[in-house]
Amino acid sequence: LLTKYPNTYFTTLAIDRFVSVFKDFPESNFIILNSFKHLVDSGRVKIYAFVIMRDHIHIVWQVLGGQSVEDVIMSFKKHTGKLICNYLKDVDRKYLEYFISDRKDREYKIWKISKGNILVNSPNMLNVKIRYIHKNPTKGDYKTVEDSTSYYFSSAKAYSVQSKNFSFLSVLDEVVNGS
């Protein structure tokens, strides 16, 4: 796996204060999807699995071109944070109060500080992380659906029926076939 998929990470990014922005403003999910597409189209990453939950996202992605995962995350969070702020300014300015920053270098803070990048270093770990991502909408406090393939903002359907919902997604045959 390390030679086939080097620099592959399981990453969790959470909204600051765990505000449910993706649930309260479903259009903000498309900001994330479009940003994923941009990262893939620009050759910065390959995305193997993802889920967007009400206040966080999980991704299994491969960082390309000699970049660090931290640089990609910083760029992604800066870009999506700005777009989410602009969107909220247009649709519900009061909601932005949840994100007022106490730092002098920014007015708002959308994302929490990221600490959760785990290098995926085996085929088993890859399968475990992708299954975890796909089951996220069916478990515990985050349960929104019974069947993970019916949750739109996830790669689960692509792994069950080879759906092409998301052009930026690279489906791994090893995971589909369970090997």
Task: Give, region by region, the residue ranges found by the protein language model.
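Short catalytic/metal-binding and nucleic-acid-binding patches
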Residues: 1-179
